[in-house]
Amino acid sequence: MPKMKSHSGAKKRFKKTGNGKIKRKKANKGHLLTKKNAKRKRQLRKSVVVDDKANRDRIKRMLST
């Protein structure tokens, strides 16, 4: 049986940290930025850790295969 492939969309959107946590970028930073204030755009630059256990396990499974 051939090897399973990693999920291409998940590879582009998520990174695994050294501790095994999953990092992702925040949404709403693509366009229509003139109506968003500077504080909001600055906060959208930061990446966040996926907290929800169900989502975290699903993402790990997509990345590991």
Curated annotation (Swiss-Prot):
Transmembrane segments: none
The keyword Ribosomal protein appears for this protein: yes
Record key words, sorted: Ribonucleoprotein, Ribosomal protein
Stored InterPro entries: Ribosomal_bL35, Ribosomal_bL35-like, Ribosomal_bL35_CS, Ribosomal_bL35_sf
Annotated region (Disordered), positions in chain: 1-65
Listed Basic and acidic residues bias regions: 48-57
Pfam families per record: Ribosomal_L35p
GO annotations of cellular component type: cytosolic large ribosomal subunit
PROSITE patterns named in the record: RIBOSOMAL_L35 (PS00936)
Family indicated by similarity: Belongs to the bacterial ribosomal protein bL35 family.
Record NCBIfam families: rpmI_bact
Name of the protein: Large ribosomal subunit protein bL35
Annotated organism of origin: Salinibacter ruber (strain DSM 13855 / M31)
Taxonomic lineage of the native organism: Bacteria, Pseudomonadati, Rhodothermota, Rhodothermia, Rhodothermales
